[in-house]
Regions:
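Short aromatic-enriched loop/helix-cap "lid" or pocket-rim segments at secondary-structure transitions
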Residues: 125-128, 178-179, 257
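Loop-centered beta-sheet repeat module
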Residues: 167, 171-228
Length: 380
């Protein structure tokens, strides 16, 4: 008699199994939303004004599950299908897994987030839902903002208009070889503490029409070499108007973004650049004509330079680049605002400055015209 009972007990579903959790979600014992985010477009590509060709592209496809386990605990898991699935060596998860975290909020004034999450860096473009960003500035396009970490968020006032965040997270998912195309510079040893520490303040003003976000970060990237970020987002939203101005700055004692390092071409023995700095200004103005139609213009102005001579690289500005964008968007169905059609134009220009002449580099101007669709499909 004991054998059948033991066998039955052996196959009982544990209460924390995947199947059990899914059943609780479906039974509404866990309050959750589950979206399939989808963005595709027909794109025409141009280089220096010459037509290169056209193609259909699936820009974004991802699964986004988030919800509450109890009054004090919530979670989020988001999987992208447009990023690498290779498991990185540091975090033991692929870059395609953007969110995988648990949030503890014991009271309205405090929240602790543990797991894979967004780096605490200010700037609206970086923080925005990437489904609705047609083209990122080069500064944001060269950073991986999703890292394993711990973040504490504290509300600073009773109205909860001001918040302070403190975060410790991995600065990278892989090894130095995954980040630096030509390895660390000669004579420099890798860091044993590849973490990034950030502090961020966010505040609302003028009946929440203004949201200001300011952040600072520091990370050791090698022994005796650091990376510094200063960033801010200034967001305005009232009535039919939405606008923002971001300022992003990084001072990199080793060129982590690799934008100057990648300019090296034939005739040189390529090395990883040191003492790089990047500055970006990103602005957008959007106007909603009615519940269905909206339009925006957006632009970015960015500089890349070296603040201190190292090896064959003298100090000075190496590159200036900019982009200009314009878009018209239409929501055809009043009852399904998650579905949107858009037409978008992009121009990206690059100018190499005097100190970069010896690199023999060439970065062409490019243009893109797109017609596309976005759909956030609510599965749950």
């Amino acid at each position: 008699m004991l054998l059948p009972l033991s066998a039955a007990a052996q196959y009982d579903e544990p209460c924390d199994s995947i199947t059990s959790i899914v059943e609780r979600v479906m039974d509404k014992k866990i309050k959750a939303t589950f979206n399939v985010d989808f963005c595709t477009s027909l794109n025409g590509y141009f280089t220096e004004g010459d037509f290169d060709g056209a193609s259909l592209k699936l820009n974004r496809l991802r699964l986004d599950l988030k919800g509450g386990i109890s009054e004090q605990f919530s979670f989020r898991v988001r999987q992208s299908f447009n990023k690498a699935y290779d498991k990185n060596s540091t975090e033991n998860v692929p870059n395609s897994l953007e969110y995988a975290n648990i949030q503890w909020h014991p009271n309205p004034g405090f929240k602790l987030t543990v797991g894979k999450q967004f780096l605490t860096i200010a700037g609206y473009e970086a923080l925005a839902n990437s489904m609705y960003v047609r083209e990122f500035a080069d500064f944001n396009d060269n950073l991986n903002f999703y890292r394993l970490g711990i973040t504490g968020a504290i509300k600073l006032d009773q109205e909860r208009n001001h918040e302070l965040q403190l975060q410790i997270a991995n600065n990278r998912g892989g090894t130095d070889a995954d980040i630096y195309s030509y390895g660390l510079p000669a004579g420099i040893e890798p860091t044993k503490l590849p973490f990034i520490a950030s502090v961020c303040w966010s505040g609302y003003f003028d009946d929440k029409a203004w949201n200001l976000i300011y952040a600072a970060s520091v990370a050791p990237v090698a022994k005796g070499k650091n990376l510094y970020y200063l960033s801010c987002g200034n967001i305005y939203e009232k009535g039919p108007i939405f606008a923002y101005l971001d300022v992003m700055y990084s001072r990199e004692e080793i060129d982590t973004q690799q934008r100057i390092t990648s300019l090296q071409s034939g005739g040189l023995v390529p090395v990883t650049v040191q003492n790089a700095e990047y500055l970006s200004f990103i602005a957008k103005f959007e106007y909603k004509f009615n519940s269905k139609w909206s339009a925006y213009v957006k632009g970015a102005y960015e500089t890349s330079g070296i603040y201190k001579e190292n090896g064959i690289f003298g100090a000075g500005r190496y590159m200036t680049n900019w982009n200009a964008q314009a878009s018209v968007e239409w929501v055809p169905f009043e009852k399904d605002k998650g579905f949107k059609l858009f037409a978008h134009y992009l121009y990206k220009g690059y100018s190499l400055e005097g100190p970069a002449a010896f690199l023999n580099a060439y970065v062409p101007d490019i243009q893109r015209v797109s017609l596309g669709a976005i759909y956030a499909i609510p599965v749950l």
